[in-house]
C-alpha cells in the first residue's frame, strides 16, 4: 500500500518492494542479524514485502510464505507459498512439512475494528497461535519475530519469549507510523 507523501511508501515503490513494511524488517535485521543458514517461515505474508526481503537474505534452505490471501510473488527456486489459515490443522501440517525453520517472521495483524481493546485482544490471540506454531517448527537456537499491538496483554507474550529465548527485545522500528500502537518482539536463540 503506497500513500503519497509517506517517505517509506515512496522508497518501497522506487526499490520495487510490495509494501513499506519491509523497512521495519530491514532495520531490525541490520541491528539484530536475524538471518542465518536454514529455512525461513513468513506467517501473514501478504502483500509480500517481508518475503521479498527474506528471499534476498536466504543463505541456504527454503522460504515458506503463508497467508489467507494470495501474494503476487513467484520465485522459481527455494520458495513455497501456502494459502491457508494458521488456525487450521491442514495449514499447520503443510508448514511442518517444510520445516524445521531457523527463522520465523510475522508482520500479521488482525482485521482492525477501530476499537483498541478488541484489536489488541485479537492481536494477542493471533500472536499466541503464531508462537505456539513457531515453537513446533523452530530449530534450537532459531529466531522469532512477531508484530504485536500495545495496550492489551502483550506482556504475556513477552514473558513467553523470555521463558524460551536466550535474547529478547521489544522493538519499535522507525518505519512504524507515528499513530500506530504496533511494536515487534524478537526472540533469538530458541530453547536457551
Swiss-Prot record:
Specifically methylates the uridine in position 2552 of 23S rRNA at the 2'-O position of the ribose in the fully assembled 50S ribosomal subunit. The gene is rlmE. GO terms for cellular component: cytoplasm. Its EC number is 2.1.1.166. Its main location: cytoplasm. Belongs to the class I-like SAM-binding methyltransferase superfamily. RNA methyltransferase RlmE family. It comes from Borrelia garinii subsp. bavariensis (strain ATCC BAA-2496 / DSM 23469 / PBi). This is Ribosomal RNA large subunit methyltransferase E. The lineage of its organism: Bacteria, Pseudomonadati, Spirochaetota, Spirochaetia, Spirochaetales. SUPFAM superfamilies: S-adenosyl-L-methionine-dependent methyltransferases. HAMAP family: RNA_methyltr_E.
Amino acid at each position: 500500500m503506497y500513500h503519497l507523501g509517506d517517505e517509506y511508501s515512496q522508497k518501497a515503490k522506487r526499490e520495487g518492494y510490495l509494501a513499506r513494511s519491509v523497512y521495519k524488517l530491514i532495520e531490525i535485521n541490520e541491528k539484530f542479524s536475524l538471518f542465518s543458514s536454514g529455512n525461513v517461515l513468513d506467517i501473514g505474508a501478504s502483500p509480500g514485502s517481508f518475503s521479498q526481503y527474506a528471499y534476498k537474505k536466504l543463505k541456504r534452505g527454503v522460504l515458506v510464505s503463508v497467508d489467507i490471501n494470495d501474494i503476487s510473488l513467484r520465485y522459481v527456486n527455494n520458495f513455497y507459498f501456502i494459502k491457508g489459515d494458521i488456525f487450521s490443522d491442514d495449514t499447520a501440517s503443510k508448514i511442518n512439512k517444510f520445516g524445521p525453520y531457523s527463522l520465523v517472521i510475522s508482520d500479521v495483524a488482525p482485521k482492525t475494528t477501530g476499537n483498541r481493546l478488541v484489536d489488541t485482544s485479537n492481536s494477542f490471540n493471533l500472536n499466541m497461535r503464531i508462537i505456539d506454531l513457531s515453537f513446533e517448527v523452530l530449530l534450537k537456537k532459531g529466531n522469532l519475530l512477531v508484530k504485536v499491538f500495545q495496550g492489551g496483554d502483550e506482556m504475556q507474550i513477552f514473558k513467553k519469549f523470555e521463558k524460551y529465548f536466550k535474547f529478547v527485545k521489544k522493538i519499535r522500528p522507525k518505519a512504524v507510523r507515528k499513530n500506530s500502537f504496533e511494536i515487534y518482539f524478537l526472540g533469538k536463540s530458541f530453547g536457551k
